[in-house]
From Swiss-Prot:
Assigned keywords, A-Z: Arginine metabolism, NAD, Oxidoreductase
Main function: Catalyzes the NAD-dependent reduction of succinylglutamate semialdehyde into succinylglutamate.
Family the entry assigns: Belongs to the aldehyde dehydrogenase family. AstD subfamily.
Organism: Salmonella schwarzengrund (strain CVM19633)
Entry-linked HAMAP family: Aldedh_AstD
Pfam families to which the protein is assigned, alphabetical: Aldedh
Enzyme class (EC, first level): oxidoreductase
EC number(s) given by UniProt: 1.2.1.71
GO BP field: arginine catabolic process to glutamate; arginine catabolic process to succinate
Catalysed reactions, as listed in the record: N-succinyl-L-glutamate 5-semialdehyde + NAD(+) + H2O = N-succinyl-L-glutamate + NADH + 2 H(+)
Domain of life from the UniProt record: Bacteria
Protein name: N-succinylglutamate 5-semialdehyde dehydrogenase
GO terms for MF: succinylglutamate-semialdehyde dehydrogenase activity
Length: 492
């Protein structure tokens, strides 16, 4: 029984599915997808649960969410292993994901009060009050790269605001989704407040097509995000929050501290085997001897990176990609760029055929035309050389995406220029592109999102503002508007 609907675990009636470890092929999870009728049933359960949940005092909702945080802490080792085995990422990195899930609770509570709490301004004849109200029933679509943390960033603020939810994890990480939902069940969520539907494209389409949804919160690829945007066009009554990918530039202007610059680049491009939406995809390196030396050192150090199993000892820096198919897609993208005229600096290699273990690849594309403006979700770094900083910014902005951008330089003025001219939601200076703070908004512009950033700003799309002018008494104004006559006439 792999679906959780209205507080009950039930068996899916859709397609049979199984999940294996992307390196060992060990079967980790088996179950059936939710069919369209079960998706509709989950929505009905969420709708029925909404009035009571929305009317619960905030303190009651907070108590359940904090109980969930305590359960995450108590079961950290178990959830870490589930995430690591299912995604292929090393145990150390999966542990940081669970820590981020735990930290998200306190941050979301603070964000709720800071961004969507109640504010009152006293007036001469009453008060002006700003309150926030939940949307109702929301669908949450989760990605596979951070199958615990990223859905958590939607689910927690949505529940705190008083919404009820239908959660569809990625079909590539059903085990993590199920494990997390079982902790929510133990936290004491009332039946119907949070529902789990497993499945792939058909389940997702059934969910996003429901007329009774009040909104949809999505983290994933730009292609799927665009499909959802088209599907919900003409429905302004529904909130739609899209957190999509990026073709992110990292500018290396000054690499005098060579190894520090190389370390920052490795963290930006290859952590999580390149499967972070903020990963550097385009490396812009200044022309000259220093840039040449930097690239040589980068290729040297990156060439020593050996991906390994989730439980290897010692732990590797990177593990496997989500699937062998994903690794093959990266290889095909590299070959395509070679065919366009790219010069390979570091050849990506499959460690073992049939697995998702893939070494990093680096290819220079200076002067190459018709390079696809796409997010290759894996350890492939494209290099361009530039002559002056204005050219670097032009290259950085030469993309339909706009998620993250970074600069390695000692010149504050260059960073200030980048802040003014970069088209990206995250702009970092001498910090990895993959570094982000939950106390700041997380999101981008262009093909990277629809101006609904998450993290600290997730509270914004989980509730709508209600403005009130209020007074306990009804009084006639001392001064009336022109043309109004309230004088009493004597009866004739």
């Amino acid at each position: 029984m792999t679906l959780w609907i209205n507080g009950d675990w039930i068996t899916g009636q859709g397609e049979r599915r199984r999940k294996t470890n992307p390196v060992s092929a060990e079967i980790l999870w088996q179950g059936n997808d939710a069919n369209a009728a079960q998706v509709a049933e989950a929505c009905q359960a969420a709708r029925a649960a909404f009035p009571r949940w929305a009317r619960e005092p905030f303190a009651a909702r907070q108590a359940i969410v904090e109980k969930f945080a305590a359960l995450l802490e108590a079961h950290k080792a178990e959830l870490t292993e589930v995430i690591a085995r299912e995604t292929g990422k090393p145990r150390w990195e999966a542990a940081t994901e669970v820590t981020a899930m735990i930290n998200k609770i306190a941050i979301s509570i603070k964000a709720y009060h800071a961004r969507t709490g109640e504010q009152k301004s006293e007036l001469v004849d009453g008060a002006a009050t700003l309150r926030h109200r939940p949307h109702g029933v929301l669908a949450v679509f989760g990605p596979y790269n951070f199958p615990g943390h990223l859905p958590n960033g939607h689910i927690v603020p949505a529940l705190l605001a008083g919404n009820t939810l239908i959660f569809k994890p990625s079909e590539l990480t059903p085990w993590t989704g199920e494990t997390v939902i079982k902790l929510w069940e133990r936290a004491g969520l009332p039946a119907g407040v949070l529902n789990l539907v497993q499945g792939g494209r058909e389940t997702g389409q059934a969910l996003s097509s429901l007329d009774d949804l009040d909104g949809l919160l999505f983290t994933g690829s730009a292609s799927t995000g665009y499909q959802l945007h088209r599907q919900l066009s003409g429905q302004p009554e529904k909130i739609l929050a899209l957190e999509m990918g990026g073709n992110n530039p990292l500018i290396i202007e000054d690499a005098a501290n060579m190894d520090a610059a190389v370390h920052l680049t490795l963290q930006s491009a290859f952590i999580t085997a390149g499967q972070r939406c903020t990963c550097a995809r385009r490396l812009l390196v200044k022309q000259g001897a220093q840039g040449d030396a930097f690239l040589a050192r980068l290729v040297d150090v990156a060439g020593r990176l050996q991906p390994g199993r989730w439980d290897d000892d010692p732990q590797p820096f990177i593990g496997g990609l989500i699937s062998a198919q994903a690794a093959q897609h990266v290889m095909e993208a590299w070959r395509q760029r070679e065919a366009l005229g790219g010069r390979t600096l570091l050849v990506p290699r499959k460690v073992k055929e049939g697995t998702s273990l893939l070494t990093p690849g680096i290819i220079e594309l200076t002067g190459v035309t018709d390079v696809p403006d796409e997010e290759v979700f894996g350890p492939l770094l494209n290099v361009w050389r530039y002559a002056h900083f204005d050219e670097a910014i032009r290259l950085a902005n030469n993309t339909r995406f706009g998620l993250s951008c970074g600069l390695v330089s000692t010149d504050r003025a260059q960073f200030e220029q980048l802040l003014l001219e970069a088209r990206a939601g995250i702009v970092n200076w001498n910090k990895p592109l993959t570094g982000a703070a939950s106390t700041a908004p997380f999101g981008g512009v262009g093909a990277s999102g629809n101006h609904r950033p998450s993290a600290w700003y997730a509270a914004d799309y989980c509730a709508w503002p209600m403005a009130s002018l209020e007074s306990p008494e009804l009084t006639l104004p001392a001064t009336l508007s022109p043309g109004l006559d309230f004088s009493r006439r004597e009866a004739v």
